[in-house]
Amino acid sequence: MIMESIIATDIKSFLFSNGLISDHQFGFRPGHSTLDMLLLFSKQWVEVLNARHEIRAISLDISSAFDTDWHPALLTKLSSYGIQGHLHSWLAEFLSCHNQRVALNGVLSSPHPVQAGVPQGSVLAPVLSLVFINDLSDSLQHPLYLLDDDSTLCRTICNPSDEQAAASSLFADLDKITSWSNTWNMSFNPDKSHTHYLSPKGPFGTPPHLLSQQSS
């Protein structure tokens, strides 16, 4: 536990001091919190609505994120951020030294190596999760705000003629997010992912079902 704490502190110091974590990440980041993210949304969205514009937002939730971070992918990402050498080897050993067994009708299976997930309760879990999720927002057209593994994609609609372009660009970003999840063996929980339609002009019709269309 002491060794894990020292390494977690060193990794966080390296990542944050070199600006390697997304500016839109509010989870497990010094000086950032859930409240900061909510205040940012409140300020931005009130300004947009006061200007008589509209907002489309998509909130996404990764299914069991702490349990599904794929170890080979995580190690690849750590290396790409400059965490290499002996530290990288130590982390590889740390991730590979866990096994799981299943008991059924009083019979215990043989041990099976755990190949995904970060150890629950470990002080390393939050920072490793941050590294894994960090590149999700790369190459997107719209800002993706992150609270650890929860994310929100936003687009402002300034006039009705922007509606189709907004839908197309959000679809394009969802395609990129889907590609990211396929590449890194992750999945999003449709029951906890939602579209949001904010307008000062209500009442208004049913918003486009972006998520249901995306998953079809």
Tell where the protein language model's regions lie, with residue ranges.
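Short, conserved phosphate/pyrophosphate- and ester-handling motifs at nucleotide-, phospho-/glycolipid
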Residues: 121, 125
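Eukaryotic intrinsically disordered and solvent-exposed regulatory patches
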Residues: 42-45, 138-139, 182
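Short, conserved micro-motifs composed of acidic
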Residues: 106, 160, 172, 187-216
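Conserved pre-catalytic core of RNA-dependent polymerases
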Residues: 1-119
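Catalytic palm subdomain of template-directed nucleic-acid polymerases
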Residues: 64-81, 152-182
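Hydrophobic alpha-helical membrane-association signature
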Residues: 37, 41, 128-132, 169-173
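Short, charged alpha-helical motifs in flexible N/C-terminal segments and linkers
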Residues: 46-54, 178-196, 203
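Active-site palm subdomain of RNA-directed nucleic acid polymerases
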Residues: 7-25, 55, 126-158
